[in-house]
Amino acid sequence: MAGIGFELKKLFRRKGLFASLRAYGYAGIICTGPMLLGVLLQLGILLLCSWSGAPRDQQDLLVCMITYTLLFSLTVTSFFSMPVTRYLADMLYEEQEQTILPSFWGSSSMMLVLGCTLYGLFLLVSGATLLQGLLCLWLFAEMIVNWNAMSYLTAIKDYRGILCSFLAAIALAFGLGFVLVVLLGCPVLEGMLFAVTMGYGLMMVWDVVLLYRYFPQSEESPWAFLRWVDAFLPLAFTGLCTNIGLFAHLVICWAGPSGVQVKGLFYGAPYYDVPALIAFLTILVTSVNFVVSVEVNFYPKYRNYYSLFNDGGVVGDIVTAEEEMLAVLNRELRFTALKQLFVTAAVLSLENTLLALLPLGFNDLMHGYFRTLCVGYGLYAVGNTILMILLYFTDYGGAVAAAAVFAVSASGLTALSMALDPAFYGFGFLIGAALFYLVTLFRLDAFTANLPYRVLGQQPIVAETKAGRFTRLGLFLKHKKRKPTKSAKHSAS
């Protein structure tokens, strides 16, 4: 990601409003692509449905289906995302580009089999019609491939291609939805769901074409990445727990007193969901700042510090490099927190004016949720930035512990808040995000207080190779692929 930051930094140096907008567009899409695309499509769908005069129950069911599909796909990919990214980084560092495409299809296949099986079972009993269920499953499969492809696309630094695929997906979804629903009078639910599916499908094809343009095809095993899942299992659970903490409060509200049964197993809480989606956009500034400022300024000091250990630097130089690195880190984290505080305060001050421009029907309760969740998402954004720094220092244990605290506290406190007045529903997530921020902050402070010991004393004397269930699964799949069939044996004889 630091390499991405350096490339984006070049764009920010260019003069002019258009250059700045393009740089922020690249950074925003790269950092928060999946959720940003989902939020924009949700808001656009609501606007199109209101223009077409669609019944409220159809709008609610459409939003529920897309939201369920989005959150389920992000949950499945969250477990594999960090280990796959680590595998990708290692292979690029070792100049093993021939392993990239096989690992992409291997990881995508693994997530598709697991995710489509579970989500397909849910759709069978959800109350959706056959056509609606097939469209949801189709959309889910496209999202899995798209979210996985984002990790690989950032490696090739083709930000224009990423931006174009992103914009093309939105344009096709909105344009096709307008034609089908508004002009041709197709059923709102099926027409809009098909349009969104086509939009994500275009993005998927575009991204895969980009990958094939940059990485060579080969006969390498597509399951080699599974060894990295075993070796970096804390990374997998860090991603999963962070995802649970980020989205569990939505699901709990659906099942709570404010939840509404839209159809079958599809529940929603419109008064809570819409403010949550819009409040999520306020963390964009911190996500962008982390890549283009924190990492760009911190990484050279970080690299210099660790190179002194690898290249036999003297103690005095190591101590000086450590002081410089931590000074830059503290400064950048402080600036990040201040920027997020400024954005949150500005949004809270202008929210009545800004939200009045959108035909979303905000009432006093929704305004309260929006303010509460803006603060919660702001704390999460800063805490997540510190979590990334813990991963820089390979404090995987501290990172997974902080993510687990976030998942348990945000989920548990939101569940407890269901017994309170509806005005307090967002406070469970806010307190969970605050705990997440405090745990990551204290853990980073404790970890860096004795950094030389962490670098040298906690490393294993002998290199360890972890061969767990995922490694054995990879070997099994690799062996099964190479095993000749009976017909092949007969023809050979």
Question: Whereabouts are the PLM-identified features?
Answer:
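Alpha-helical transmembrane segments of multi-pass membrane transporters/permeases
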Residues: L153-V179, L390-G412
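Transmembrane helical elements of multi-pass membrane transporters/channels
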Residues: A195-G199, M203-E295
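N-terminal membrane topogenesis motif
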Residues: M1-L41, D60, C64, L226-L235, ...
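Hydrophobic alpha-helical transmembrane segments
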Residues: S165-Y212, A423-D445
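Alpha-helical transmembrane segments of multi-pass membrane proteins
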Residues: T67-F72, S108-V113, L121, V125-L153, ...
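Small-residue-rich midsections of specific transmembrane alpha-helices
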Residues: V63-A89, N243, F247, A276-K301
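Hydrophobic faces of transmembrane alpha-helices in multi-pass small-molecule transporters and flippases
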Residues: S20-L36, L163, S221-A248, L333-F342
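Specific pore-lining/lateral-gate transmembrane helices of multi-pass inner-membrane transport
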Residues: L92-F104, D273-L357
